[in-house]
């Protein structure tokens, strides 16, 4: 199992090719059984400050193409990006995909023929607006593997690992001057 963002399918294809056909996409389980989840990731395109007006104009033109032009959006999505626009996210072409294309142009039913984008789009529609990242999110994510890894290798239970991770985060928060409730 892997709890991750919608950007992961193409990373799996390129990074774990032997998993081809063995993975499936599902909604993340929650304690109360709801389908609510949180955002994990995203991407940004920026223009760095420059006195070269031609370069700035070209960069802006590219950003417009990549983010607002249907062809540019399709190019990014075909390359593995998750769509940031609702038209693509709701399109039948996107929702009905069952295969990923590798860098050699070969199609792979990495998720066993599943319409994987249907699940990813459903998850995107159910992102909670009340979720907030920790002010020390990078620390928290970095420490998670330290504790979850012990559960994965059988040195402890997942429940105990999560409890230890929580205590670590509470201690760290207090050390950094945050009030822990």
Show which residues each predicted segment covers:
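Extracytoplasmic/periplasmic substrate-binding proteins
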Residues: 1-61
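Acidic, low-complexity intrinsically disordered regions
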Residues: 3, 19-21, 106-107, 112-115, ...
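A generic secondary-structure signal for well-formed alpha-helical elements
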Residues: 6, 16, 69-70, 169, ...
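Mature extracytoplasmic/periplasmic domains
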Residues: 10-14, 43-138, 179-180
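Homeobox/homeodomain signature
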Residues: 15, 35-37, 106, 110, ...
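Conserved C-terminal helix/tail region of periplasmic/extracytoplasmic solute-binding proteins
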Residues: 106, 118-181
């Amino acid at each position: 199992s892997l709890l991750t963002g919608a950007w992961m399918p193409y990373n799996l294809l390129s990074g774990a090719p032997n998993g081809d056909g063995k993975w499936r996409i599902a909604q993340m389980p929650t304690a109360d059984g709801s389908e609510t989840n949180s955002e994990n990731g995203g991407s940004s395109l920026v223009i760095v400050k420059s006195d070269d007006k031609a370069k700035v104009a070209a960069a802006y033109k590219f950003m417009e193409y990549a983010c607002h032009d249907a062809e540019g959006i399709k190019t990014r999505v075909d390359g593995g990006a998750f769509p940031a626009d609702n038209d693509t996210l709701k399109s039948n072409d996107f929702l009905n995909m069952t295969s990923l294309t590798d860098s050699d142009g070969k199609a792979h039913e990495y998720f066993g023929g599943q319409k994987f984008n249907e699940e990813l789009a459903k998850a995107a529609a159910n992102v909670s607006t009340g979720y907030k990242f920790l002010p020390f999110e990078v620390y928290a994510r970095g420490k998670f593997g330290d504790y979850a890894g012990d559960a994965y290798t059988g040195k402890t239970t997942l429940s105990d690992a999560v409890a230890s991770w929580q205590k670590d985060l509470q201690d760290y928060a207090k050390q950094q001057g945050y009030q822990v409730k």
